[in-house]
A protein has these predicted regions:
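Conserved micro-motifs of the catalytic ATP-binding
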Residues: 115-120, 153, 157-161
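A conserved beta-strand-to-alpha-helix junction within the catalytic ATP-binding
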Residues: 121-139, 192
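Short helix N-cap motif at coil->helix boundaries in the Bergerat
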Residues: 127, 215-226
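Short alpha-helical segment of the dimerization/phosphotransfer core of two-component systems
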Residues: 95-100
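Short helix-loop "hinge" at the ATP-lid/N-box region of the Bergerat-fold HATPase_c
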Residues: 176-177
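Membrane-proximal HAMP signal-relay module
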Residues: 1-55, 70-77, 82, 112, ...
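Glycine-rich ATP-binding loops of the HATPase_c
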Residues: 257-264
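Short conserved segments within the C-terminal catalytic ATPase subdomain
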Residues: 141-151
């Protein structure tokens, strides 16, 4: 009993004091076990915190347009809105309804990407063609924001999921338009990686989205791909951004083992985001 107790006691002490595990004395044979348990505990706590923050952010983001819709519709229903205001109120309801729908779609998509299976419908596709289609889809939005969009480069074949690539390029370009300045530019370039960097892997492909927008300071650059994180909240509100576009981009890149994501930016000068694809015919 004494021997059993002497073995179990440090483990029980550890279980009761996970947050102060460094101060708990254990046999040297148990040190790797303690380190593993501590890391797992930290991962669980971090994920729990992220879930709580995400839930709080979702609640806030959903509440804002719903409050606006409820307020304007109540004024119309009660007859308190003047005839000349009804059309304007209806336009606000329509705008906030669209914002709400976009937000819900993005939340659902993020949830789907969290559960994406490896090797899910990956195929060889032309990323230049996808970028070209995206530019055509967003021309009206770019014109509305007084932003010029141009596509450069050459046709390049990569191995990827087609739907995800459509979403990746769309979200990168949409973000570059929304956070640009009137009279600004968005340049999308698809080319071999060596065209950007002579030391890059031969055969690799890069898609680059570069804008002349507000830019991102150093302290914000690591967090810009987090869900609902916004550098300029007032700009997001005025442009209708959900704060989830770049989070979706990060998830899509993570789902492709042959892809990597990088960002360079300077406040007042703009942002450049690159997604690089290694030369692979499969994701093994």
């Amino acid at each position: 009993h004494f021997l059993t107790g002497s073995i179990i006691e440090p483990i029980e002490n550890l279980a009761d004091n996970l947050d102060a595990s460094d101060s708990v004395k254990v046999y040297k044979e148990l040190v790797p076990f303690v380190q593993t348990i501590k890391k797992q505990h930290e991962d669980i706590m971090r994920n729990a915190t992220m879930r709580q923050e995400f839930t709080a952010n979702v609640s806030h983001e959903l509440k804002t347009p719903l409050t606006s819709i409820s307020g304007y519709s109540e004024l119309i229903e009660s007859g308190m809105a003047a005839d000349e205001d009804i059309v304007r109120f209806a336009a606000e309801i329509h705008k906030n309804s669209n914002r709400l729908l976009t937000l819900i779609n993005d939340i659902i998509r993020l949830s789907e990407l969290d559960q994406v299976e490896e090797h899910n419908c990956f195929e060889e596709l032309d990323i230049y063609d996808i970028a070209q289609n995206c530019v055509e889809m967003l021309r009206l939005s770019a014109k509305k924001h007084d932003v010029t969009m141009e596509l450069h480069g050459v046709h390049r074949i990569i191995c990827a999921n087609r739907q995800m690539m459509d979403e990746l390029v769309y979200n990168l370009c949409d973000n570059a338009i929304r956070y640009n300045n009137p009279g600004g530019r968005v340049d999308i370039t698809v080319d071999a990686a060596v065209a950007f960097d002579k030391t890059a892997e031969t055969g690799a492909t890069i898609i680059e989205v570069k804008d002349t927008g507000i830019g991102i300071s150093k302290e914000h650059q690591e967090r810009i791909f987090e869900r609902f994180y916004r550098v300029d909240k007032s700009r997001s509100k005025s442009t209708g951004g959900t704060g989830l576009g770049l989070a979706i981009v990060k998830h899509i890149v993570a789902a492709h083992k042959n892809a990597s994501l990088s960002l360079t930016s300077e406040p007042g000068k703009g942002t450049c985001i690159r997604v690089a694809f290694k030369m692979k015919t499969n994701l093994e």
